[in-house]
């Protein structure tokens, strides 16, 4: 039994592995087929169609269908996919829009209701869609992309928000607009508290042939009878108010009921209309709500309709939301939702109402003669709608952009009462967030309505109406163009908005025409109107807090841009009172941080009217008019150009300017003004390029001013001081005139930089002018006292000195500024600052090239001072600030602490620089040491390598010498052997034998004599060759020995000497042989003897040659 189970397990395992292998092969073939189809640009094969079961017709054994092959995981994924007939895509149903979802109506119309019911039960997920799409529409966070067509749409959520009964406010709007009557309430509306999903069933019937039916299921009457309503539930019935034109109410035909399901609530809304146009609700319906406490909310009902249309009109009418909706109208106790024939729509984008610019032009009776550009940010209140009902004779919209009021509207007394009681404010810059709405509820008090009128041009007909004068008298104007609107600014602005404060934002308007000036009723308006320019005031939370002190009762600022004073305005006696009481103060050069606001509050008291007239052209009629002389006499032009607005100055500018004689307008001619404009244009353009950091440097430099010493002051010092004062005033007037001609869109930060630049310029000019007399340092208060004490001595000499100072060459200015900056840098440690931040760009009657040269000289001077500071190691300890008259000890200590802190900051910077320099030097030294060590190591390695090579060469040479010595020894042995053999043969030759053989040899001598001679010659040649070989070897040895003579190799010399001896022996042997050869001629015995010797020598020679070849190889 066990063997069978084991065998079966092995068979199953084998089959499993075989199946896995076949699947792997199948997957490879499928991949290759898909790639080949893509490469050939053919249609990719279908997974189902490519199966052979469709062709082979599955057998009875294979009862499974091809759908059963799919695994459970992929079945769950496929179950949520829907095919879009419009785009041919198979995508997730939970992320499809309605266009793709109902595309089945174009192909299959039989199962439309079943398919729609299935989709409705599936529901839709609200988590689809990217965050980037939602960021584009911050007010509609539910927008998402369709998974099929990537179009924005609003999905239905499972957790539908339904308004609760206890917090449901009353819904109200206008009744009859033309008749001014409100319709009576019919029924109340209540909402069913559904747990999960609420579907709205919207059914709209018409008396005409065209009819659009909206339902969720086919049974229409059973939907309201399935369940009994709960306790406290009121079934609403919605009727219609009659035609607006006839004023007759229409009777309601059908009612609205709620289907009380345990899980899903369906709302059935049936609406009848007498017109041909059909009204269709959008997906996100909302209403504007107003409760008894005058608080405004927007409740999102989110009752999304399930749409049912005839099959032939499914794709056309399902997504057409361009139908106009009528407003909802309610009353006190009983509310009734009504659709009237006015062209209004409601939306659910909280808190901003989304405008609809594509309103169809079907109803011609609405929005006639009006140009509608936008309807967003519109809040309709009950009080505003009452006024709107009185003024809505021709059905004009409340907020109109770029609308010119016609004379008919202005002459109507009803419109005057409307505009008198209407409070206008511009909240276009307020961010529309929920937090901002919570803060804005503090500002929105009773009797404050929100209407935005942009670009309204007040025509003469409106001004001539006496009823409108009271409106302009009570209207208080404020310009909030440059006021930013964060939440903190809104909190601070709540202090300014009191009861009866109605600000209006008039853009590009307010041109005072002669008709407006001639009206006596308007004179009182202009007299009570206080004008101020808040264009240069930054709108941070701190400045708003300070500005609340300045803005007191009856102070209403208006910004008039490019207002030209015409001759009619000047000749009008009523307008002279306004101009006489108006004080013109130039605040262009006043810095606007919080400290400047603190000091400026001393000047601004009650009934001070600050007017900034930009680009005012003083014509000849204005100068010659005697009525305007009072204006020029009483007008005070105060230049605060030279007054620093920091808290470090002890005396306020008010104390300094009390005794200064101020120059009026009639003292300056138009020619001088134009000349000053052309003269200082270059300097102002250069000053605009300064950075905002110059303000801090100005605060440092303005504390010390070089003035003449009292002991060494010459007689004409008073005139010089007076000339300096006049010069400063003329310069400030010129700069102010140029700044008024500057563009209006310059930000407050740039103006602050210009103000600090001008202040630094004047302080530098005073120091440069007075530096030629002495080099003592005085504080700012003493300098002003000297100027004030020498006032009133303006004469021709003073004016001449001013002109001389204005015309002096640039080199003089450069030298004075160099000396001044030298003293300041020595006392204040100005070397810590960069040359770019310190060098002032001043140009007085000079060109741009001279200014650049001056700036370059200043940079060179500062660099020189920095080098001197580093070389001398000057200590900054013990430097104290000068005492200011009337300053308390605490303030002086504070200034001392601030000054010491700045010095410590500079010292810390210098210390950090030295630390960084030492660190760099240390790193460089370490790098150099490392490099030297590497070079030393490389040299050592190279020396060791060379030494090793020399040792190897010496060993090789010693081996060669040893081989030569061995060769010589062998040769000597050979020679000795030869000699021994020769001696042996000599001893063995018997005399008798020689005698017997003599006769035989004599007989043979005749014939072989020639052959024997040849043999002997050959033997001699062999000996000669051997001798030459031995000689060459000896020469080589001698050369080698001579080359290595410095080694003092004694064994080599001994071997050479032995070789010489052997050579000598060989020579002797050769001589012996020659003698033997000569003995051949003495008979047969000599010949036989020679033959034997020759044969033996030949054998010896052959043996020696073989051994030599072996040794050489």
UniProtKB/Swiss-Prot annotation:
Keywords: Coiled coil, Membrane, Transmembrane, Transmembrane helix. One of its GO terms (molecular function) is myosin binding. Disruption phenotype: No visible phenotype. Myob1 and myob2 double mutant has no visible phenotype, but a delayed flowering. Myob1, myob2 and myob3 triple mutant has a significant height reduction and a delayed flowering. Myob1, myob2, myob3 and myob4 quadruple mutant has a significant height reduction, a reduced rosette diameter and a delayed flowering. Residues 209-229 are annotated as: Disordered. The chain crosses the membrane at residues 12-34. It is a single-pass membrane protein. It is found in: Endomembrane system. Residues 888-986 form the GTD-binding domain. Pfam families: Zein-binding. Expressed in leaf epidermal cells, roots and root hairs. It comes from the Eukaryota. GO terms for cellular component: membrane; transport vesicle. Interacts with myosin XI-K, XI-I and XI-1. Membrane-anchored myosin receptors that define a distinct, plant-specific transport vesicle compartment. The GTD-binding domain is sufficient for myosin binding. The transmembrane region (1-61) is sufficient for the membrane targeting. This is Myosin-binding protein 1. It comes from Arabidopsis thaliana (Mouse-ear cress).
């Amino acid at each position: 039994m066990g063997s069978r189970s084991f065998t079966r397990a092995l068979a199953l395992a084998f089959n499993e592995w075989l199946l896995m292998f076949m699947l792997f092969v199948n997957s490879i073939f499928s991949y290759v087929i898909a790639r080949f189809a893509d490469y050939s640009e053919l249609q990719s094969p279908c997974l189902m169609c490519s199966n052979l079961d469709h062709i082979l017709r599955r057998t009875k054994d294979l009862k499974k269908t091809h759908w059963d092959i799919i695994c459970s995981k992929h079945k769950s994924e496929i179950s949520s996919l829907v095919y879009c007939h419009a785009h041919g895509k198979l995508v997730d149903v939970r992320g499809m829009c309605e266009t793709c979802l109902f595309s089945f109506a174009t192909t299959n119309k039989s199962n439309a209701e079943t398919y729609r019911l299935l989709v409705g039960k599936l529901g839709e997920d609200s988590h689809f869609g990217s965050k980037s799409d939602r960021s584009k529409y911050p007010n509609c966070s539910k927008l998402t992309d369709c998974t099929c067509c990537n179009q924005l749409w609003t999905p239905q959520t499972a957790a539908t928000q339904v308004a609760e009964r206890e917090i449901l406010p009353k819904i109200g709007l206008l009744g009859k607009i033309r008749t001014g009557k409100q319709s009576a309430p019919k029924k109340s509306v209540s909402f069913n508290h559904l747990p999960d999903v609420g579907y709205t069933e919207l059914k709209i019937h018409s008396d005409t042939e065209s009819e659009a039916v909206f339902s969720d299921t086919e049974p229409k009457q059973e939907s309201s009878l399935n369940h009994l309503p709960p306790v406290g539930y009121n079934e609403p019935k919605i009727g219609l108010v009659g035609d607006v034109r006839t004023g007759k109410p229409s009777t309601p035909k059908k009612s609205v009921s709620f289907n009380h399901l345990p899980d899903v609530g369906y709302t059935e809304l049936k609406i009848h209309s007498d017109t041909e146009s059909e009204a269709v609700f959008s997906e996100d319906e909302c209403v504007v709500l107003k409760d008894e406490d005058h608080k405004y909310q927007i409740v999102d009902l989110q009752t999304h309709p399930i749409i049912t249309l005839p099959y032939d009109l499914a794709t056309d009418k399902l997504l057409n939301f361009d139908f106009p909706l009528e407003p909802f109208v309610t009353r006190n106790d009983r509310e009734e939702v009504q659709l009237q024939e006015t062209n209004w729509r409601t939306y659910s984008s909280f808190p901003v109402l989304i405008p609809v610019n594509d309103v169809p032009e079907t109803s011609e009776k609405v929005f006639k003669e009006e140009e509608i550009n936008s309807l967003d940010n519109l809040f309709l209140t009950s009080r505003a709608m009452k006024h709107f009902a009185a003024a809505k004779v021709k059905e004009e919209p409340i907020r109109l952009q770029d609308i010119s009021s016609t004379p008919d509207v202005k002459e109507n007394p009803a419109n005057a009462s409307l505009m008198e009681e209407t409070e206008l404010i511009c909240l276009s810059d307020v961010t529309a967030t929920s937090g901002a709405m919570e803060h804005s509820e503090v500002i929105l008090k009773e009797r404050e309505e929100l209407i935005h009128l942009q670009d309204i041009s007040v025509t003469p007909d409106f001004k001539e109406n006496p009823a409108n004068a009271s409106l302009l008298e009570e209207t208080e104007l404020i310009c909030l163009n440059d006021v930013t609107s964060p939440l903190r600014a809104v909190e601070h602005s709540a202090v300014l908005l009191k009861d009866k404060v109605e600000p209006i934002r008039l853009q590009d308007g307010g041109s005072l025409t002669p008709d407006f000036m001639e009206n006596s009723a308007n004179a009182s308006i202009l007299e009570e109107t206080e004008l101020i320019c808040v264009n240069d005031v930054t709108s941070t939370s701190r400045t708003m807090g300070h500005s609340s002190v300045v803005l007191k009762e009856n102070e209403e600022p208006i910004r008039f841009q490019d207002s030209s004073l015409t001759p009619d305005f000047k000749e009008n006696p009523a307008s002279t009172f306004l101009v006489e009481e108006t004080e013109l103060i130039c605040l262009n050069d006043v810095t606007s941080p919080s400290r400047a606001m603190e000091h400026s509050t001393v000047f601004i008291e009650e009934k001070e009217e600050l007017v900034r007239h930009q680009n005012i052209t003083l014509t000849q009629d204005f100068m010659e008019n005697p009525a305007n002389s009072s204006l020029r006499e009483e007008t005070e032009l105060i230049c605060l150009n030279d007054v620093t607005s920091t808290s470090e100055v002890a005396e306020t500018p008010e104390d300094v300017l009390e005794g200064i004689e101020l120059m009026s307008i009639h003292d300056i001619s138009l020619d001088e003004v134009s000349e000053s404009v052309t003269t200082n244009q270059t300097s102002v353009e250069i000053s605009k390029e300064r950075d905002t950091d110059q303000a801090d440097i100005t605060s440092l430099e303005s504390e010390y001013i070089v003035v003449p010493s009292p002991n060494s002051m010459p007689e004409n010092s008073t005139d010089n001081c007076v000339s300096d004062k006049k010069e400063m005033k003329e310069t400030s007037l010129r700069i102010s005139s140029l700044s008024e001609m500057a563009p209006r869109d310059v930000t407050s930060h740039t103006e602050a930089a210009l103000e600090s630049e001008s202040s630094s310029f004047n302080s530098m000019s005073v120091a440069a002018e007075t530096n030629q007399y002495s080099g003592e340092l005085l504080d700012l208060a003493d300098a002003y006292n000297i100027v004030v004490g020498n006032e009133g001595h303006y004469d021709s000499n003073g004016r001449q000195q001013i002109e001389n100072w204005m015309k002096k060459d640039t080199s003089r200015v450069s030298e004075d500024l160099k000396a001044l900056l030298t003293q300041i840098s020595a006392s204040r440690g100005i070397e810590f600052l960069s040359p770019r931040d310190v060098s002032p760009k001043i140009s007085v009657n000079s060109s741009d090239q001279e200014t650049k040269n001056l700036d370059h000289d200043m940079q060179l001077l500062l660099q020189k001072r920095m080098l001197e500071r580093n070389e001398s190691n000057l200590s900054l300890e013990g430097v104290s600030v000068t005492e200011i008259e009337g300053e308390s000890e605490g303030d002086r200590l504070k200034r001392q602490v601030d000054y010491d802190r700045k010095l410590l900051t500079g010292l810390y910077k210098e210390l950090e620089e030295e630390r960084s320099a030492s660190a760099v030097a240390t790193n460089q030294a370490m790098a150099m040491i490392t490099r030297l060590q590497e070079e030393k190591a490389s040299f050592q390695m190279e020396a060791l390598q060379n030494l090793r090579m020399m040792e190897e060469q010496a060993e090789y040479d010693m081996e060669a010498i040893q081989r030569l010595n061995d060769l010589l020894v062998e040769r000597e042995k050979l020679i000795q052997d030869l000699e021994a053999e020769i001696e042996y043969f000599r001893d063995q030759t018997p005399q008798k034998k020689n005698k017997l053989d003599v006769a035989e040899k004599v007989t043979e001598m005749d014939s072989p004599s020639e052959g024997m001679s040849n043999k002997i010659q050959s033997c001699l040649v062999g000996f000669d060759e051997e001798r030459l070989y031995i000689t060459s070897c000896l020469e080589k040895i001698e050369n080698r020995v001579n080359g290595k003579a410095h080694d003092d190799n004694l064994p080599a010399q001994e071997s050479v000497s032995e070789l010489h001896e052997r050579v000598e022996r060989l020579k002797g042997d050769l001589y012996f042989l020659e003698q033997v050869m000569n003995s051949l001629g003495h008979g047969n015995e000599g010949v036989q003897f020679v033959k034997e010797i020759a044969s033996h020598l030949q054998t010896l020679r052959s043996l020696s040659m073989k051994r030599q070849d072996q040794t050489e190889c």
